[in-house]
């Protein structure tokens, strides 16, 4: 591709990034607006503490509030119009109606409880993202502490699609130990609430806490969990995640490692994704940035394999591999024009780990392995059977390091919707 043509393509992608960022800021502002002019849902959730302090332990969740060191924005790409818009809107409404029939219950520890939103005690905000906010809450009937993702029902088709996709995937994935579990949902006229298991923190925040690399033995167990989660999504539900990155990988003090955030996942048709909407530019595979055949911009699960490879390099080295980039334009250009990142030889990584990452970051997607091949790799086989005390390592890191600071945190006196 000629340089001028490439620059034009990347400039268009960057323009779409900026547009998406404006939309994201608008959605967050909508959620955080506490002015009297905006009607409020009639939710009365008493706060655990009226002192205005945030719960110190509420750090992680299916959403992730701490911004990474370099802004990594959601990239909105042109979508192929294979479904009539009106039919798609009808399908969204039908799926929402189906899910609404299942609301009003929480299933925790194998027990099903009838519940409503007022049965939850708000312990404070855990974070906010493009879709809304996540709250730490206590289920009064049992005392269980859970994470509750709140998303506004704005009427915007794309936002509703994200809500539905996230709901659909987590509700169906109850039998996968490597995907964050959903306890139930509550739907009001203005909001959708998804009750999730409370995890400790995400890999992105762990990297920030440690201010350096995560050990290979931990990344080995993490790789096994994430590859199996992605393989499960593809084989069981025909879904591609499309947003694999450290902030969507959760860990907890029990040593569990799970994948989360399925709002921009896509359905696979003949094993290929037919839409190009959404994704994080920093982890996007070359074939998604610049499709080999622009008239058929299909891609498959190997795009997520690339994202996993970039994530592993970042976590293993403590640095994002495409350094010194001030804009997403620069990152996208480097992904297309430079050789793929590798694990540096001087940091003591095993040959199996280096080989696995190299396979994931094969630039030609046709030669990049799929999940079934990755599961046969000696790196995966080794860490499938090796005993690693992830729980003790996790608790040690959390005890000896400080939580990454977040800006613009609201005190409990200003938690919207829960007065």
UniProtKB/Swiss-Prot annotation:
Residues 18-30 have a biased composition (Basic and acidic residues). The modification N-acetylalanine is found at residue 2. Residues 120-380 form the Protein kinase domain. It comes from the Eukaryota. Signal peptide: none annotated. The keyword Metal-binding applies. GO terms for cellular component: cytoplasm; nucleus. Residues 377-400 are annotated as: DVD domain. It is found in: Nucleus; Cytoplasm. One of its GO terms (molecular function) is molecular function activator activity. GO terms for biological process: apoptotic process; cellular response to interleukin-1; cellular response to lipopolysaccharide; cellular response to osmotic stress; cellular response to sorbitol; JNK cascade; positive regulation of DNA-templated transcription; positive regulation of ERK1 and ERK2 cascade. ATP binds at residues 126-134, 149. Residues 18-77 are annotated as: Disordered. Interacts with VRK2. Interacts (via its D domain) with its substrates MAPK8/JNK1, MAPK9/JNK2 and MAPK10/JNK3. Interacts (via its DVD domain) with MAP3Ks activators like MAP3K5/ASK1 and MAP3K1/MEKK1. Interacts with MAPK8IP1/JIP1, MAPK8IP2/JIP2 and MAPK8IP3/JIP3 scaffold proteins. Interacts with RASSF7, the interaction promotes phosphorylation. Found in a complex with SH3RF1, RAC1, MAP3K11/MLK3, MAPK8IP1/JIP1 and MAPK8/JNK1. Found in a complex with SH3RF1, RAC2, MAP3K7/TAK1, MAPK8IP1/JIP1, MAPK8/JNK1 and MAPK9/JNK2. Belongs to the protein kinase superfamily. STE Ser/Thr protein kinase family. MAP kinase kinase subfamily. Dual specificity protein kinase which acts as an essential component of the MAP kinase signal transduction pathway. Essential component of the stress-activated protein kinase/c-Jun N-terminal kinase (SAP/JNK) signaling pathway. With MAP2K4/MKK4, is the one of the only known kinase to directly activate the stress-activated protein kinase/c-Jun N-terminal kinases MAPK8/JNK1, MAPK9/JNK2 and MAPK10/JNK3. MAP2K4/MKK4 and MAP2K7/MKK7 both activate the JNKs by phosphorylation, but they differ in their preference for the phosphorylation site in the Thr-Pro-Tyr motif. This is Dual specificity mitogen-activated protein kinase kinase 7. It comes from Rattus norvegicus. The gene is Map2k7.
